[in-house]
Amino acid sequence: AFSGILAEADIAAALKACEAAGTFNYKAFFAKVGLTGKSADDIKKAFFVIDQDKSGFIEEDELKLFLQVFSAGARALTDDETKAFLKAGDSDGDGAIGVDEWAALVKA
């Protein structure tokens, strides 16, 4: 899903670092997976991969399954991790993360 954007080895390392429930940190994950240093275009491409229902927003249910977009065998985020992730990215308070909010979150 992220071919041409992210390296498989980086994805594997990023997932390994947050295997245990409660250890997910979006900033650390973005850095490990190599997203932080990507172009605005690649960051947008990643958004559209994560936006599974193609609504133009990443909603809470999509955030919960965020890690599984990178690898089908990955765990779901805990409710606390999901809510913290949403709160960090949802700057306009509409309950979802739009593409511009996503870009700002990745670069934060």
UniProtKB/Swiss-Prot annotation:
Coiled-coil features, chain-numbered ranges: none
A Gene Ontology cellular-component term: cytoplasm
Keyword check for Cell membrane: no
Domain of life, source organism: Eukaryota
Residue span, EF-hand domain: 38-73, 77-108
Keyword annotations: Acetylation, Allergen, Calcium, Metal-binding, Muscle protein, Repeat
Binding site for Ca(2+) 2: D90, D92, D94, A96, E101
Binding site for Ca(2+) 1: D51, D53, S55, F57, E59, E62
Secretion signal, residue range per the UniProt entry: none
Miscellaneous remark of the record: Is regarded as an important allergen.
Stated role: In muscle, parvalbumin is thought to be involved in relaxation after contraction. It binds two calcium ions.
Protein's name according to its UniProt entry: Parvalbumin beta 2
Species of the source: Merluccius paradoxus (Deep-water Cape hake)
